Every structure is written in structure tokens, then in C-alpha cells.
């Protein structure tokens, strides 16, 4: 394992089962492996004192372990874990306005069939996703146009 001689621990931030971390300026967006926390938004403007700014929760049986932010738009995956989980929540993507990171606002939820979205990338316009889809076995590749985040369109 590599070791750095010029680093030292300034602080830690205890959060439940972190998945992916996305950094924008002084804000960390953390996707979680287990409910109820889907996504944590952490203010690290004072690196010695990181603070939870907001969190987005998901119901039992679901997780949002991936997160991406471009501009003022945050997208998180909604993926079913195991056989349990409220089917009405549904798999897909949660699309949020994070122009005020401490107050994330759901713009819309794009739904998919089955277990939901597992991995994806987002370039600010297009989301390249791997959802489960009706008529297919397993995850497939799909592209969503988020020119208007309130109305995602499959390309």
C-alpha cells in the first residue's frame, strides 16, 4: 500500500455505509449503501469541522449508493436491495436541484422497470445509465437527455 509522508488527518465524518463520494468545491455528496440515508450532503468549507448540510432518505429495501453533480443538478440512483422494499418507491433516478446544497429539492424521479439503476455517469446534459428494463435480462445501457431536468428523455 502506498503511503504519503506529507498528509495528516484533520478530521473525520462518521456516516452510514458510504458508497460513492462526489466533490464540488467545499461540498461532498455521499451515496449510501443502506437506508434510511440515501445521500448525505456534507459541508467541508472548514476541513477540520465537516458538517452534515442535508440528507436525502430512501425507504427500507432501497439504496442510492451512487451520486453525481453537474452545475446545480444532482442525480442519485434508486436501486432495490434484495426481495423486500416498497414497490411504490420504484427504481430509477432521483433528479435534484442543489443550487442550495443544504436544501436539495427533488425536481423529478425518472422511473425504470425492475430493480432500478445501478451504475451511471452524468456530464451535465446526458446521463449514461445501466438500468433494468422491461423485456431485457439484467442491466442494459441507456442514455437520458437531461437538457430539461424536469423532463428526462430517453435518447
Feature locations, PLM:
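Feature marking well-ordered beta-strand scaffolds used for ligand recognition
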Residues: 1-155
Amino acid at each position: 500500500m502506498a503511503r504519503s509522508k506529507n498528509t495528516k488527518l484533520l478530521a473525520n465524518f462518521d456516516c452510514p455505509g458510504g458508497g460513492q463520494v462526489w466533490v464540488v468545491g467545499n461540498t461532498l455528496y455521499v451515496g449510501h449503501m443502506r437506508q434510511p440515508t440515501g445521500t448525505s450532503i456534507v459541508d467541508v468549507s472548514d476541513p477540520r469541522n465537516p458538517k452534515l448540510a442535508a440528507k436525502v432518505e430512501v425507504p427500507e429495501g432501497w439504496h442510492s449508493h451512487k451520486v453525481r453533480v453537474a452545475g446545480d443538478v444532482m442525480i442519485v440512483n434508486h436501486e432495490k436491495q434484495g426481495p423486500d422494499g416498497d414497490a411504490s418507491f420504484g427504481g430509477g433516478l432521483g433528479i435534484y436541484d442543489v443550487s442550495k446544497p443544504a436544501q436539495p429539492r427533488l425536481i423529478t424521479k425518472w422511473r425504470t422497470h425492475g430493480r432500478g439503476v445501478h451504475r451511471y455517469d452524468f456530464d451535465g446534459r446526458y446521463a449514461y445509465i445501466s438500468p433494468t428494463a422491461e423485456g431485457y435480462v439484467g442491466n442494459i445501457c441507456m442514455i437520458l437527455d437531461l437538457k430539461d431536468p424536469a423532463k428526462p428523455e430517453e435518447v
